[in-house]
């Protein structure tokens, strides 16, 4: 098999949540443990950081990887989903896994996989863990795929666990209350391993506290002592932060939600410092070194790690075009605020969703005065463009329906004046289709 054929095999022969939804979700870690045993427990060969939560875990994971790279570590990064190419999921120092490694891994292990009937994510996780060992990484940042307790990344014992926040998503699998979802996410808390919680509320905080106490895990709530005291959004993109103890630092990632992600990140860096992975800041020389690494890491996250789709400016002007992967109510509560702040003559929104989200909840958050281009991503779970158009009309949102993201985007470009603004989003797959079109 060549690389494309190998990807098709993975997408079609292994149950894939991104394409099939809940029917591809496997409860239990039996397959994961069997794969881990087969490959000789590769994740034990390097340090790991485990990042879960509903929203923000991708940005936090990539930011951590960028800072650790700047500190001189060889850093593995495992995230999902990919937007354009499967290899985005598995990176070392920003470089995607090679096509040849993907092909060789699948071809050499196919006979072992097929009797197990593993899911796509089980195979991909095993590939990532083995690749990081084979390539001798120092540390790997591992993003949870879905939930936490039963996620197949949850066989690692990390240096620190991170849970960014909790909101409603995948409720058919994780539970229909915030407390139930938090309990699933809290499943990544390991005995004696520090855990940082980015955001919590009266419903979720007791869940985290109880689990941490049960596991004798030191717990830090980032909200209790926020490090980011100011965030200035720069016209050209990115954010200028004022951080307690460190002063002003420029971050390259856009998005009104990024200050919360950075607030989550700072206590994680403190844990890594305490464990000797980062320079201690008590001495002037160390403080200067750490500040440089922090500035360089946060200032070049996208460049160092390949992160895309987070308030990404894909066309800077005439008209300006931005895309974002926000896909649930929690994400859109932030995106709607950001869209309200955009200065333009008319806003054009290319929009599509998948069918297992709270579609009405998201539609209610969208700006009523925008012109809409409803579309369907190239994904089996995507809502049909006409159905979405009709559902949106009940929320006072009006526009035409287009069968592909490319056609919707081209229509928006034709209609938009120089001083208009175009936004593309609603799901990761819509953004992925856009980036494929642009590439």
Show where each model-derived region lies:
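Short functional linear segments
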Residues: 1-53, 60-62, 66-71
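ATP-dependent carboxylate-amine ligase catalytic core
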Residues: 22-29, 33-44, 70-156, 172-174, ...
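Membrane-proximal helix-turn-helix segments that form the acceptor-binding/catalytic region
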Residues: 182-191
């Amino acid at each position: 098999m060549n690389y494309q054929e190998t990807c098709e095999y993975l997408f079609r022969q292994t149950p894939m949540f991104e394409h099939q939804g809940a029917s591809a979700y496997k409860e239990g870690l039996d397959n994961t443990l069997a794969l881990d045993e087969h490959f000789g427990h590769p994740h034990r060969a390097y340090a790991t950081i485990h990042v879960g939560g509903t929203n923000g875990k991708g940005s936090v994971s990539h930011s951590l990887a960028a800072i650790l790279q700047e500190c001189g570590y060889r850093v593995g990064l495992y995230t999902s989903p990919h937007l354009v190419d499967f290899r985005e999921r598995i990176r070392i120092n920003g470089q995607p896994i090679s096509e040849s490694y993907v092909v060789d891994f699948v071809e050499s292990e196919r006979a072992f996989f097929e009797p197990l009937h593993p899911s796509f994510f089980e195979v991909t996780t095993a590939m990532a863990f083995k690749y990081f060992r084979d390539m001798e990484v120092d540390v790997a940042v591992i993003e949870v795929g879905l939930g936490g307790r039963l996620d197949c990344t949850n066989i690692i014992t990390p240096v620190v666990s991170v849970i960014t926040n909790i909101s409603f998503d995948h409720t058919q699998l994780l539970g229909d209350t915030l407390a139930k979802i938090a309990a699933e996410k809290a499943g990544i808390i390991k005995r004696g391993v520090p855990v940082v919680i980015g955001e919590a509320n009266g419903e979720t905080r007791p869940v985290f506290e109880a689990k941490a106490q049960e596991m004798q895990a030191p717990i830090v709530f980032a909200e209790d002592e926020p490090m980011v005291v100011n965030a200035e959004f720069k016209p050209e993109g990115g954010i200028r932060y004022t951080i307690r103890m460190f002063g002003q630092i420029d971050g390259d990632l856009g998005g009104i939600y990024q200050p919360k992600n950075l607030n989550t990140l700072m206590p994680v860096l403190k844990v890594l410092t305490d464990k000797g992975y980062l320079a201690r800041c008590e001495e002037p020389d160390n403080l200067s070194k750490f500040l440089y690494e922090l500035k360089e890491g946060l200032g070049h996250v996208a460049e160092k790690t390949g992160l895309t789709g987070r308030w990404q400016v894909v066309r800077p002007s005439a008209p300006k075009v931005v895309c974002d992967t926000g896909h649930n109510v929690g994400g859109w509560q932030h995106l709607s605020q950001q869209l309200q702040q955009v200065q333009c003559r008319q806003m054009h929104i290319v929009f599509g969703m998948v069918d297992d989200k709270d579609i009405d909840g998201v539609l209610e958050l969208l700006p009523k005065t925008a012109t809409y281009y409803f579309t369907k991503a190239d994904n089996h779970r995507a809502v049909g463009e006409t159905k979405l158009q009709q559902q949106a009309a009940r929320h006072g949102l009006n526009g035409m329906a287009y069968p592909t993201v490319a056609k919707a985007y081209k229509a928006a470009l034709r209609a938009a004046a120089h001083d208009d603004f175009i936004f593309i989003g609603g799901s990761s797959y819509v953004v992925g289709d856009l980036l494929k079109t642009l590439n």
